[in-house]
Amino acid sequence: DFVGIGMGTPGSVDIEKGTVVGAYNLNWTTVQPVKEQIESALGIPFALDNDANVAALGERWKGAGENNPDVIFITLGTGVGGGIVAAGELLHGVAGCAGEVGHVTVDPNGFDCTCGKRGCLETVSSATGVVRVARHLSEEFAGDSELKQAIDDGQDVSSKDV
């Protein structure tokens, strides 16, 4: 028997209501009532939090955090996220985004971000961001490289290639 289900999701989360307020990298631009849907379908308790927050808790309990009461965890993937555990408590902050560093503006004239802003950290440092930067820089690059050739040939390029 299951006691309940816990889930981490990208984007802004209302942990009280169990809704995803906006997960732009998943193209969720409207409120998603995840808790209501899961609980009504399965009949067991459901808890929801931001994926970087959940990862920070996991890293604190079972990972490099070694159960330290103070842990900061940064996630790099489609976006850039972060979770902060201070004095043993997960910090949520406004809209559950205490550690969400991906949407800090690092270049006001930078690339457009999925959140609607311009020049966010994740536009250049996430898995998709480093590919975007490589494609942008390859336009001016006059040297010889396998990456430049792949981009020029229209091949799919991933962050692993970069």
Task: Set out the residue ranges of the language-model regions.
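Glycine-rich phosphate-binding loop and adjoining helix at the ATP-binding site
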Residues: V3-I5, S12-I72
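Short glycine-rich anion-binding loops that position phosphate/pyrophosphate groups of nucleotides
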Residues: P10-V13, G77-G79
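Active-site/binding-pocket entry motifs
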Residues: G11-V13, G110, H136
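Hydrophobic alpha-helical segments typical of transmembrane helices
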Residues: P33-V34, A56, V80, E100, ...
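Generic secondary-structure signature for well-ordered alpha-helical cores
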Residues: K62, L90, V106, R135-E139
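Glycine-rich phosphate-binding loop of actin/hexokinase-like ATP-binding domains
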Residues: N67-V124
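A mobile "lid/hinge" subdomain adjacent to the ATP/sugar-phosphate binding pocket shared
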Residues: L121-V162
